[in-house]
A protein has these predicted regions:
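Membrane-proximal alpha-helical anchors
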Residues: 1-69, 73-80
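An amphipathic alpha-helical interaction surface
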Residues: 3, 48-49, 67-69, 74-161
């Protein structure tokens, strides 16, 4: 009878151990999802009194911070220095632009937005705004970032347009 009690106790203890390990695995998977960042870009445009502004914004719409590991701009498919790419794309309008280049190890918090590029220019019609927007569309952005759990993700504007 004592052997039966001992074996039963051992089986119950092993079941409790297996259940605890399984619960730990499930909890860890949940924790990873609960701090997953999600980066995306969008463009805003406004025109008022023959003056227009186009802005390209980056937003972290995820549930945790995005740790920037690489920030790279491409012009017509070629990797370029950010300032050179913007100057090449915008030409004379580059002098009327404000830009933000996110450095490595920058931590973009949850729900944070950054204006990556803002261009202000005279525009008597919507066609002028559209022509500047086409120039900006020649720029592409690749951002490699990680979550608090160091899971690497890549934002690629060429795939997300």
């Amino acid at each position: 009878m004592e052997i039966l009690v001992s074996i039963s106790s051992l089986i119950i203890a092993l079941c409790a151990l297996v259940f605890t390990i399984w619960q730990t695995y499930i909890q860890r998977a949940h924790n990873r999802l609960s701090v997953k960042p999600h980066l995306f870009t969008f463009t805003t445009k406004d025109r008022n009194n023959n003056l227009a502004r186009l802005q390209v914004l980056l937003k972290n719409n995820g549930l945790g911070p995005a740790f920037i590991n690489k920030f790279q701009i491409y012009y017509k498919g070629q990797e370029c220095e950010p300032d050179a790419a913007i100057n090449a794309a915008l030409g004379e309008w580059a002098k009327n632009s404000i830009r933000t280049i996110l450095g490595e190890e920058y931590a973009m918090s949850e729900k944070e937005s950054e204006v990556l590029l803002s261009v202000t220019f005279p525009a008597e019609s919507d066609e002028v705004v559209e022509s500047i927007e086409k120039k900006i569309d020649q720029l592409d952005l690749i951002i490699e970032y990680s979550s608090a759990y160091e899971k690497m993700e890549t934002y690629d504007s060429r795939k997300n347009s």
